[in-house]
Structures are given as structure tokens and as C-alpha cells.
Amino acid sequence: MITITQTKSVEDIAKIQIIMQKYFKPHEIVSNNEFIYYIENYNKLYEGEDYFVYKIEDKNEIIGMLSGVKLNEFIVVDYFIVDAAHRCSSKYIMNTMINILKSYKLPIVIEAETESLCRLYQMFGFKKFSNPYKYIMLDVSMEENTSKILEYDSNLLFLSPCNLDFETTKQTIYKKHYMRWYSIYNDKLTKEYKKKLCV
């Protein structure tokens, strides 16, 4: 039986990282220590807001994860991944994931790099902003004294019904989600990102 439960366990995060390494690009993968630090300290650094992680298990084996940020304005889904061998249960997993996100009583937004992902989310009630959206991030897999800005076309979706304004939502994601993440690495990365956003 598949279960989805919240976790901050160091052991769980290590198992989740193994799945991430199978499917994510190197610049999208963070170290265990950095991930755990962020999970444990986010709500202390930003009062009233939180970073959450849910492990997806089948018979006590971790097969995926859902993570995101509860901001004051809305929920941002950060990572959502399920091991390929268990995607036959994707309908149940998606419905359970959405119910978990709805429990926060806030609007929900999610990024989708591909049209196939967009179609998947749209099957479960998400709608795509018609405005063009850029995925802007820094390559944190590089050496500490260097950084590289990665920018490519993506899509931003919201769970309907929702009255979020696109431009405000986009800027909030850039400045309150990504910029905060880079701040745990070093000042250079944060300055690079601020420069890109012109803030």
C-alpha cells in the first residue's frame, strides 16, 4: 500500500536523494546537509512560512517525494518525483498529493518544464498561466567560487480555482523561493541571482 507522510528524517532524506540522482540533472540536486538544513531552519528564518517534505512509500520502501514551500501568499511545489517502476499508481499518488497541498488552505502553484508534465497536471485540475515563464536558477553543482545562471522556458500552473496574478506570483517565486534557497550557500550566489532579477 502506498502512503505519503511528512518527514524531516536524515535517513529518509538520504534515501530520497538516491531517487533524485536517478532522474534529476546534476545542477538540480543538492547535498543532504544543505537539504536538511533548509528543512530544519526555514520556519525559524522566515516566520509563518515553512518548507515541507513528504516521502512516498510502498511497503516501507521510499519510491518518491513531494516537497514545497508554504509562503504567506501561496504554496509552491518544489520537487515532485516518483520512481518509474511505481508510476502505474500515479493517479492515486497525484490525488493524494493534491489533497495534502489543499490542506494548507492556500493557492497552489507548480512549475512544469515540459508540455507532457503540463498535460498531466491539467488532468488533475491545474491550469496554465498563458504568460511566458522563465525558469531561472543558479547551477549550485559548480565550484563554490563560481556560479552559472541557468535560464530556460518553462510553464507555471495553478490549481483552479485561484485568483493569483501572474506577475506577482512569478516575482514571489523568484524572490522568496529561489533567492532564499541560494542564500544558504554563500553571498556570491545570492548576489548573482539578485543581479539577474535586477533587485
Question: Model-derived features: where do they sit?
Answer:
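Conserved acetyl-CoA-binding loop-helix of GNAT-fold acetyltransferases
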Residues: 85-101
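Residue-level recognition of the GNAT/N-acetyltransferase active site
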Residues: 82-85, 113
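Hydrophobic beta-strand segments of well-ordered beta-sheets in folded domains
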Residues: 1-2, 106-110
